[in-house]
A protein has these predicted regions:
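Catalytic core of DAGKc-family lipid kinases
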Residues: 1-116, 122, 167
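A hydrophobic alpha-helix/topogenic segment detector
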Residues: 90, 97-98, 111, 135, ...
Length: 207
């Protein structure tokens, strides 16, 4: 495998080489999140995952050519994984945890390991290999939400005086009653007390 990419000055991040024979191809956020959570709950080793789609794949600059995963040009990367204790029950996520009542009203809280949520560059500084979660929270008036939404694709909604941004390895938060939680786009249900932390380099992916 040939080393390439750098996350910090003077430090290599990633290697080149095809997806191994025992690797698993996961096509979207839901498949990846379920695989990680099932392995963690079953105390099983995580397989190497090939990514032809999803928010983590988009953040890493992957291509839509799934055949690339079998070539020497494919990139191997060690990725951080998030875990969240939700009212006493543990879950895992790879791209993002989002807590909200609505995108249009009330408090919005998110912990991002990946920059993208769909077409939105929601957390433009988030990097899934830097050991930190980008935690963004705020409760903007409707007019400001409309303006911010128009900038989400480009990531220029930040910085914003009404949004708080923190970069942390772990944190705890208490949500307002009636707030729902999504992990990698999958609904978990209503949540009140969250304890979030990052597991550095817990996942081996190929793009």
């Amino acid at each position: 495998l040939k080393k390439q990419m750098s996350i910090k000055r003077g430090q290599d991040w990633g290697q080149n080489g095809p997806l191994p024979a025992d690797g698993v191809v996961v096509h979207n956020n839901a498949e990846l999140q379920k695989l990680v959570e099932d392995c963690r709950l079953g105390n099983q080793e995580l397989p190497t995952e090939g990514l032809p789609g999803g928010d983590l794949w988009r953040t890493l600059g992957g291509t839509k050519q799934q055949s690339r995963l079998q070539t020497a040009e494919a990139q191997h990367l060690k990725i951080d994984v998030g875990s969240v204790l939700v009212d006493g029950k543990i879950h895992w996520f790879v791209a993002h945890a989002v807590a909200r009542k609505s995108w249009w009203r009330g408090q919005v809280w998110l912990a991002a390991n990946a920059a993208h949520l769909g077409n939105w560059n929601l957390a433009p500084r988030a990097h899934p290999g830097d050991g930190l979660l980008d935690v963004i929270s705020g409760n903007l008036p409707l007019g400001q939400r409309i303006k911010a939404r128009s900038r989400l694709v480009s990531g220029t909604h930040l910085p914003h005086p009404g949004l708080t941004v923190r970069r942390v390895a772990a944190m705890q938060v208490t949500l307002a009653p009636g707030t729902s939680l999504w992990l990698d786009g999958q609904p978990v249900g209503e949540a009140r007390d969250l304890s979030v932390r990052l597991e550095p380099e817990a996942l081996h992916v190929v793009i």
